[in-house]
Amino acid sequence: MADQLSSGMGNLSIDQQPPSGPQMGGQGQMRRSYIPPHLRGKMGDAAPPMAGPNGLNNSAWAGNNNYDARGPGGGGNWPAPGGPPGPGFEGQQGAGWGGPRPQGGFNPNAYRGNAGAGAGAGAGGGGGSFSNRGSGDGQWRDGKHIPGPANPRVERELFGTPDDPSKQHTGINFEKYDDIPVEASGDNVPEPVLTFSNPPLDNHLISNIQLARYNVPTPVQKYSIPIVMGGRDLMACAQTGSGKTGGFLFPILSQSFHTGPSPIPASAAGAYGRQRKAYPTALILAPTRELVSQIYDEARKFAYRSWVRPCVVYGGADIGSQLRQIERGCDLLVATPGRLVDLIERGRISLCNIKYLVLDEADRMLDMGFEPQIRRIVEGEDMPKVNDRQTLMFSATFPRDIQILARDFLKDYIFLSVGRVGSTSENITQKVEYVEDIDKRSVLLDILHTHAGGLTLIFVETKRMADSLSDFLINQNFPATSIHGDRTQRERERALEMFRNGRCPILVATAVAARGLDIPNVTHVINYDLPTDIDDYVHRIGRTGRAGNTGIATAFFNRGNRGVVRELLELLKEANQEVPAFLETIARESSFGGGRGGRGGGRGGGRGRTQTADYRKFGGSGGGGFGGGFGGAPASGGYGGGGYGGGGPPAGGYGGGGGAGYGGGGGGGGYGGGGYGNPGGAGGQSWW
């Protein structure tokens, strides 16, 4: 190309030739330079002097020509002698291309992918080592945990500022949590802790808790911290918004900071010391993408500046980026069951080093049909057996079938029931309005005009209604967005982010956002469509009144919702809320054969004791059950009056006899003695 350029220059006329002279670096010799067509024939000022052969040594590429000409900021952006440095990250050792060159030759540790070596500074901008892990990395060196340096930018990202509306802070009723009753059953239950202190917690974790501006442990944290730190398994029920996530993250991270990483099997190391398969020591399973993302964000907060690297995997997102994240190191893994099974099948995750297994919202995972995947993960892969790991189950509700499932996953566990689980917080003011379907939109507009300000979460039953209602509100000049299962993960995350930061203070959602999501500072929850299950209602309104803050929950009720009227009445009375007269009237109508009977049958069954009590104490009790039936003549039965009872878990589970089966026939056992009964046939036959 240079020859072509030279030959081309030879064809230029003399008046187009550049002048010679010392200013061109040629000491009187002719140097030909290319002149653009629009400048040809014009005599201009001489070009600035360019020292060195070919005029390169004063450019940003000078170092490529002459190694010794480089300035002190080596690495990728080599500055010109006497010129400004390259655009590296100023002041950061090895964090960018402008960092200093490595001293003393090649450092093989800088290229390793483990948590200890190379977790500090990068290799002088050479790019071989991954940079600090974003949350500020510490190291595990010589059996000690060495926290990394503070990073103000990352701290603002993780913890926000005191007046940041997107971060949850404790509210005015937070101290009332001390009045919530707590029941712990099991052998040798440890005493609760009253403060975040050492012991039992690690000092570095306490500093991160202080950065998050958490001052006092919630009731579930007061009990779960000493239980988990003592090596015990735990099944915990807690009122929504009570700090369940901290209840398992605090003790797991504290113990990890003390004990350090588990050794990776010798066969696992790949080329250059970097393995493709991850060996996490803690696994947290949750049912939805939003919930695992939320838990991951909390884990990043409390693992800040530590050696522990949290990772998150879930379906509906690019698996390639998740694999790259895992390859960079994964000590604490938050996952949905389906995506985790996929990664295990790909050979990218091993569970052989798991010390802590957490099932969050376990009842919801079973409701969504994840039991086969959960059993495969826990029992069918290389996870240590129940006696070689700690297992924790957390949820807002624990129906009896979940408690029985715990026999397979937990050992000598402590059952913790905090507050009225399956009930609601008194921080939430519940209002039930009688609204026919055709009037719902106009009533909704009245409410939104009346309660302007704050974040409002509106729950509907169908995806189509979510989009339709959000479009209607936008046309009425209300800034709204929607979230449901048909939206892509990127769209869902964007909608949640706009809702959190207040750009769209109205969010219309289906049940996908109802369970476990911690959306800070929601002041009003509206059940535009009431759910058919009272537990779903509990979880929906639990999105407000969190961490001691107050909130309002409004429900649109009509005779189409009479299936939940009895349970709704009981719920309002438990939480000391106003009970409208029309609810009492419709409840009386339902009791005369119209609607579904109560699930309670007294306090013996239904949402009461069986949802919150330790079945090991009450496993043999019958009574109640789903009593009442769907209504109708005794011959057609309904749910039957036999009830949960039975002979304790080993003898037959849901127990039985008595009453009709699910829809017909008489007699019939429970789960253990003949199943639910066969509709239209003899009750002794089983569906199972």
Curated annotation (Swiss-Prot):
Record bears the keyword Nucleotide-binding: yes
Gene3D superfamilies linked to this entry: P-loop containing nucleotide triphosphate hydrolases (3.40.50.300)
E.C. code: 3.6.4.13
The entry's keywords: ATP-binding, Cytoplasm, Helicase, Hydrolase, Initiation factor, Nucleotide-binding, Protein biosynthesis, RNA-binding
Gene giving rise to this polypeptide: drh-9
Domain Helicase ATP-binding per the UniProt entry, residue ranges: 225-416
Region of interest (Disordered), ranges: 1-170, 590-615
One GO MF term attached to the UniProt entry: RNA helicase activity
Pfam families: DEAD, Helicase_C
Biased composition (Gly residues): 88-102, 115-129, 592-608
Motif (Q motif): 194-222
Domain of life per record: Eukaryota
Localization of this protein: Cytoplasm
InterPro entries in alphabetical order: DEAD/DEAH_box_helicase_dom, Helicase_ATP-bd, Helicase_C-like, P-loop_NTPase, RNA-helicase_DEAD-box_CS, RNA_helicase_DEAD_Q_motif
Its biological purpose: ATP-binding RNA helicase involved in translation initiation. Remodels RNA in response to ADP and ATP concentrations by facilitating disruption, but also formation of RNA duplexes.
Residues that hold ATP according to the record: 238-245
Biased composition (Low complexity): 103-114
Biased composition (Polar residues): 1-15, 55-67
Homology family: Belongs to the DEAD box helicase family. DDX3/DED1 subfamily.
Name recorded for this polypeptide: ATP-dependent RNA helicase ded1
Entry remark concerning the domains of this protein: The Q motif is unique to and characteristic of the DEAD box family of RNA helicases and controls ATP binding and hydrolysis.
CDD domains, A to Z: SF2_C_DEAD (cd18787)
Placement of sequence motif DEAD box: 360-363
